[in-house]
Amino acid sequence: MAIEFKLVPLFGSGAVLCRRKEVRVWGTAADGQTVAGRVTTADGLILSEGVCTARDGRFLLHLPPMEQAAGCTLTVTCGAETCTSTDISVGEVYLASGQSNMELELQNADEGQDLIAAHDDPLVHYFNVPKKSVWDDDAIAAEAASHWERVRPGYARDMSAVAYFFARKLARTIDCPIGIIDCYWGGTSVTCWMDKEALEATAEGQRYITRYREQGGDKPFDQWRQEEDAFWVEMNAWNAHVAQLKKDNPGISWPEINETVGPCPWHPPVGPGSPYRPGGLIETMTKRVVPATLTGILYYQGEDDTAKTEHYDVLLTAMVMRLRQLFRDDSLPFLNVQLPMWIAAGDEDKHDWARLRLAQARAASALQPGGLAILLDCGEFDNIHPTDKRTPGERLCDVALRVVYGMDAPESPRALGKYTQGDTLVVTLSAPVLRRETGELLLEIAGEDGAYHPVQSVTLAGTEMRLRSVAVLHPTKVRYAYVNWGKVSLFGRNGLPLAPFAFEG
C-alpha cells in the first residue's frame, strides 16, 4: 500500500509553533522522497524553511528558529503534492499533562460558563490529544479528526481549565501567542506517563511492572475487555446509587454512603488496554506529539499516588528526564502543581497527601529548570476536584514567568534550613512570613525521640521563625502543614502561603 503524504494534525491550520527554537515538523511520506517545508508571513516573507528525506514512511523537518508571528502559512511539499496549513502562529507551546485536576474542563470550572460565552482571545490556542488507551482504528480516526482551536466565544469548553487560566495570564503578560497541547487522563498514576525505558531505569519503576504482571496485566486483550465492560456496569450502578442517596439525603457523609451501598469499586481491572497500566498512556497519547518543540511542560498529578509516596519523587524525576529526552531538550522547563488540601468527610487524616507534597518538592529541587506552584491555601473539603482552577493556573503562570522568562513574579516563601538554640528550633526562610488570625499554625517540632508535638510559641522575626514547645526540651526536627486537610495561617507579604516543609535530619 502506498504511503500517503500528509502532515500530522498537530501542524494543521491554527497551529502554534514554538518561537526561538528549532521547530520539528513531521508527517508521512514514501521512503526516499524529498520533503520541503517553509513558514511564510501573510505578505510572503519566508520566516523559516528546511528540507529532509523521508525514511521508514515518515519525514521530519527541522525548521530554523523564528521570532514571534501570527497569521502565517506552513507549506510542506513532496514532489507534486502540497500540504498547506493556514493561520499559523509562532509563540510559546506548552504540554499540559497529568490527571483529573488538569483534565477538569473549563466548562466545569468556576467562571467557566461566562468565559466560554464571552472570552475572545486571539493569543490563546489549544490542541486536545485524543484520550485513547489502545492504538486501534478508533484511535487513528480520533487523531485524524483532532485539530487546533482558538479561545473565542462558544469555544474552549473542553480545554483544561488550569491550562486555560495559565495561558490567559501568560498571553496577557508577555503579549505572545500561547499554544497548549492538552494530554491528560483522570485517575492516572505517574507510571502511566512513563515508558518502559523510564520505568526500567529505576528499582521503583521495575516494582510497578512486576506488580502489574502479578495482577494479571499480561492477560489476553479480549479477556481484559470483558472484565472492563463488567467493571463499568458495576461502577455505573454504584454511581447511580450514590447520586440517588445524595439527592434523597442532602449532607449524607461518605461513611454513611459506603455503609449503605458498599465501598466504591474503583480501580478498573488491569490489562493490556487499561489506561491505568504502567507505561500505557505515554505510548498512546504523549508520544503522538513527540518530538514536538516545546517551551515547557505543565503537570498536575499525584492524587492517585498518595498511597505510594515513598518512591514518588524518584518516579516523577525519571518521568521528566525521559520526557526531556523524547522532546529533545535536556533543559525543558517542568512546571508542576503541588497538591492542595483535601480530605474526604469522615476519613482519618493519614498524612499521605502531606507526604506526596513533600515528594513533589524534592522532585522540584532535582528537576531544574522547573518550579512548583504552591496551593496549600487551596482545596475543598470532601471534594477532590476543586472547581477553582484560576488560582492553580495563575500561580503556575507565575512559576513560568520566573523560571522560563526570568521575570519578577510572586513566589511562596520557602523554608531553607533549621538550627537549634537550646529549647528553641529556628527555621530560616526565603522571605518573611506573617501569621493571620484565622487558620491553624500547623507547626510541629520533635526531639531525638521523633515524637512530634504542636508548637506552642512562635516568634516571627524577618526571615526566621523561632519555635518552642514545653513538651520538647531540645528540638531537632520540624515539619509544617503535615496534614491532608487544614487551614493555614502563615503567608508571605505577597499573600502567598508558606510552602510545606519537613526537616527531620
Located regions from the model:
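Cell-envelope and extracellular/periplasmic
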Residues: 1-505
